[in-house]
Amino acid sequence: MNTTYDYIIVGAGSAGCVLADRLSASGEHYILLLEAGGSDRSIFIQMPTALSYPMNSEKYAWQFETQPEAGLDSRSLHCPRGRVLGGSSSINGMVYVRGHACDYDEWVEQGAEGWSYQECLPYFRRAESWIHGEDTYRGGDGPVGTCNGNDMELNPLYQAFIDAGQQAGYPKTDDYNGYQQEGFGPMHMTVDKGIRASTSNAYLRRAMKRSNLTVRKGVVTRKVLIKNKQAIGVEIEVGGKVQSVYANTEVLLSAGSVGSPQLLQLSGIGPKAVLEQAGIAVKHDLPGVGENLQDHLEVYFQYACHQPITLNSKLGLISKGLIGTRWILQKDGLGATNHFESCAFIRSRAGLKWPNIQYHFLPAAMRYDGQAAFDGHGFQVHVGPNKPQSRGRIWITSADPHQKPNIEFNYISTEQDKQDWRDCIRLTREILAQPAMDDYRGEEIQPGADITSDEAMDAWVRQNVESAYHPSCTCKMGSDNDPMTVLNKDCQVRGIDSLRVIDSSVFPTIPNGNLNAPTIMVAEKAADAILGNTPLSPSNAPTWIAPQWETEQRNGAAQRPMFHQQRK
């Protein structure tokens, strides 16, 4: 086996597959891609509707648990991360959200020069093949296919939710990934011709045909090898046997927001006190490694449905068999969607320049494990505030790479985060009370009509909120003036040569949306930096900001007003 390559990429996930493809494309560089997991060739991964299976499987995901969270009545939350070709893009819900333009301008304000929306948009476009073709915002011939599932045609509840949002005084948006994120509209997904568009399918399949790319599965990366403040390779373990492989040019960590800080710390790069307590020799004291941890939380608003039109009638074995058979034969129908086909992004209060609350609408009432939430028909809205103030951390407690790191998000630890949740619940009730839902809306199952006071809402959220599985920001990019910055603008580790981190851990702050699309964008942009390519020319595409954002929470009045909030 060859032991020396030009580039070693650790993690064949959302970012690593992109890097493997882009760095191997010219044929002049020899690339080694290391993945702890195995093949993604499974109907449970490839068929979009089966998304709950890989997410909850030991075979395809690291099944992490958080430390007991003080803000959640000491509950520990589930935190699965992909451990398979494609990484979390092979186990996620396939929701395609780029985030708001202001999220990226915020990165620049945080010191990540070169990552403004105008500079990121060309890379979003390069990665994407939007089913309706390219325009100023959307890509038309990129590797990742995106669509709206079944275009909301298989259930009237999708459109009813959009109509209810407009009746509540919010705008409609035809494309939240384009000019206007704020508002109610169709939701987009990484599904291409009925099949999950993971980065394994989109990038790695074609790259694996090249002789200069070597992909090794079932490999545990134990640490980065550091010599004189330079990364020279990695120590790996295969079948219990430990060996070293070397990089002539660079080592690239794409192990995710849990795995990358863990690996840096195991390599002696991180907060000195953490390393010493774990029995690790300090190679480089970098206090920000594992800090700044952010995530999205969500709850399910669940209602009974008066009409027998929801997916609850499709949960039996016969229905699942018919859906699966049609998908196998035709790659369409209910098997070819994640079922989140309408959505919304709104601001919870006046004075917010861009949305901080996201809705996923589902024409069923079920749990994340795919089981029905209650007997009969129902629908639900997944909702949560997406710009939390709370920050957590990840740290190792042992030099053993097989021991899971400690993960503490410190959820809902500020008063503003608590207030955002109260506003979120009241605003959601008001939206679902609008006339467009009258023909469908039955009893409020969850939270329940008795959850009305601040105290009751706080308690219900603490007991019922779940992670949206968006851990991020643990190796943040920024300026050298910030002592907690881990990476420079080119994703290079401060103080260590020939070592970069490229995945969702590099985000300075979490975007308003799901993380797969921005992670792919980061990898596309970083690939150009690694290769020394001239960055794509910045876009001058405009973006919509609510004209009265400083004084108005929304642009209109609700037909059935229920929410009374002080204007700023």
Curated annotation (Swiss-Prot):
Gene source species: Photobacterium profundum (strain SS9)
Keyword Ligase: no
Record bears the keyword Cytoplasm: no
Active site: H470
EC top class, as a word: oxidoreductase
Any matching Pfam family: GMC_oxred_N
Single Gene Ontology MF annotation: choline dehydrogenase activity
Cofactors (names): FAD
Gene name of this polypeptide: betA
E.C. number(s) listed in UniProt: 1.1.99.1, 1.2.1.8
Full protein name: Oxygen-dependent choline dehydrogenase
A Gene Ontology BP annotation from the UniProt entry: glycine betaine biosynthetic process from choline
Superkingdom in the source lineage: Bacteria
GO (cellular component) term, any one: membrane
NCBIfam families documented for this protein: betA, PRK02106.1
Record-listed FAD binding positions: 6-35
